[in-house]
Design a protein with these regions (language model features):
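"…together with the soluble PPM/PP2C metallo-phosphatase catalytic core" -> "…together
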Residues: 2-277, 342
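Peripheral (non-transmembrane) domains and long loops of multi-pass membrane proteins
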Residues: 7-8, 12, 16, 308, ...
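Hydrophobic alpha-helical segments of integral membrane proteins
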Residues: 31-34, 114, 288, 299, ...
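Loop-to-transmembrane boundary segments
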Residues: 66-76, 310-321
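Juxtamembrane boundary at the C-terminal end of a transmembrane helix
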Residues: 151, 331-342
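Final/C-terminal transmembrane alpha-helix of multipass membrane proteins
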Residues: 316-336
Length: 342
């Protein structure tokens, strides 16, 4: 690789990231003005998806909800990313799909947040989980069709094995990746700074992979997201001034799944995002165990609440998860380098 060209590419990616960070910082006071004036307070969940009272969760986070912390701050990041991408990093082949996923996932999350703020909905104070799942699935199907028909993708790379030709079956695999990732990220957004930090790590790793693959515009998009997330983290680190809400978690999760497909690193996604897998997996295990065996595996799920329940301070859980996320990111990058993805 020509050193001068690579240096120029790095500069371009760096400028996109800085631009997203600065624009997000500039837009944040606008959001906070409206959020506090019109009381975008996040309503506390009182019951689980099975209809049971969340006694442990309520006890752990009672003081947080007493502070009336606004939600829906993810919309700031979405606006900044959309503006920077459309103005400086637009490509039908590389950035249209992840941006569409970001906006589409954000729209689903926004609807859920609005219902949550208005205090309607049962138990989880928002859209029913089944309805959110259906909406994200429909979005993923539309994106998967574009991925296969318009962009011509029809295979996946399996580390250390080779290319697996799927033809039209790439679409259901695409849907599985996007729906799973969006829900896993949404489940992980439960502690101050947790989801924002883990997403920053994951997008950084995928950005490096894309850069090494010479997908400059995908790399630029990834680091645009990182810039916006770092701006959000400035205010979301404990004690959080606001939450990203479902508008953020669904947007970033949906787009992350698309990035994994575009960089042909789907099978590295569970490694790089291992904590997203652990969070979603712990919730699923808890639900299945209570439904079929009548007992809980974890004191509280997802797993970050379990660690809180056994006495870990919220900040310790978050920072240790960040450390694990960094290690997983390095392992994923190494697998990408050695497994034939670059």
């Amino acid at each position: 690789m020509n050193v001068h060209i690579f240096s120029s590419d790095l500069n371009a990616v760096f400028m996109l990231s800085v631009g997203a960070f600065l624009l997000s910082m500039a837009l944040t006071p606008v959001y906070t003005y409206f959020a506090y004036r019109y009381k975008f307070w996040k309503k506390q969940r009182t019951t689980s998806t099975l209809g049971e009272k969340l006694e442990v969760f309520t006890k752990l986070h009672a003081s947080k909800f007493d502070r009336s912390i606004p939600t829906m701050a993810g919309i700031v990041s979405l606006v900044a990313i959309a503006v920077i991408t459309y103005c400086f990093n637009w490509s039908r082949a590389e950035t249209w799909l992840p941006l569409a996923a970001l906006i589409g996932g954000g729209a689903v999350g926004l609807l859920d947040d609005v219902i949550n703020i208005r205090g309607k909905g049962s138990g989880v104070a928002g859209l029913r989980s089944s309805l959110k799942f259906a909406m994200i699935t429909v979005l993923a199907l539309a994106l998967g069709w574009f991925f296969f028909v318009k962009l011509g993708y029809n295979s996946v790379q399996i580390p250390f094995v080779g290319v697996w030709q799927l033809g039209m079956w790439i679409v259901p695999l695409f849907v599985l990746a996007v729906v799973s990732t969006s829900n896993a990220v949404n489940i992980s957004d439960g502690l101050d700074g947790l989801a924002g930090g883990l997403l920053s790590i994951s997008y950084s790793v995928f950005g490096i992979i894309a850069l090494l693959q010479n997908h400059l515009m995908i790399a630029g998009f990834c680091f645009t997201v990182v810039g916006a997330l770092l701006s959000y983290l400035w205010f979301n680190i404990y004690p959080a001034r606001f939450f990203m809400g479902d508008v953020g978690s669904f947007a970033f999760g949906t787009s992350l799944g698309v990035i994994a497909m575009l960089t042909n690193t789907l099978f590295l996604l569970p490694v790089i995002g291992v904590l997203f897998v652990a969070e979603a997996g712990s919730s699923l295990i808890q639900i299945l165990s209570k439904r079929f065996f009548g007992r809980k595996v974890f004191i509280s799920a997802p797993v970050h609440h379990h660690f809180e329940a056994i006495g870990w301070p919220e900040t310790k859980v978050t920072m240790r998860f960040w450390v694990i996320g960094c290690v997983a990111g390095f392992i994923g990058l190494l697998l990408a380098l050695k497994g034939g993805h670059i």
